[in-house]
Amino acid sequence: MDSETFIYLLWGGLAIALIVAAITDIKSRHISNWLNLAIALAAPVFWILSGMAFWPDMIGQIGLAAVILTIFAGMFAIGAMGGGDVKLLTALALWMHWLTFLELLLIMSIAGGVLTLLMMISKRIQKTEGPIKVPYGVAIAFSGLWTIWGIAGQSSQTIF
């Protein structure tokens, strides 16, 4: 199997993992550590197969993930985001160029806003008490899938 085929298989595996993350977040408001770890550990395989240079490419991906972890850990600390969501975003940051990841964050913000509005409407219709618990993993997964769809349409060698 050539490396480009394997790269597409990795993208497909990432897409499946994102769907699993969304489903489990809807069902239990939890994204498993093993799933986030699998996403993170598959990224270096992707880097090697796509021909990324150690410097600056691979180190840049690790740096991006560190920045994302730092920013979103702050969101977790103030209760604005769950830990699984933070880890999922950090793992996704290992897969994409920082400009592509900024697009993912923009799409995630829009999808998260729509999801929150839908949850608010649902709560009002059902007349339930308590705070709204938004399964933000759904917005993260949606934005990840949207981004993967765009990347997969390009040559796997040109995304970095």
Question: Where in this protein do the model-derived segments appear?
Answer:
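A membrane-topology feature that recognizes alpha-helical transmembrane segments
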Residues: 1-160
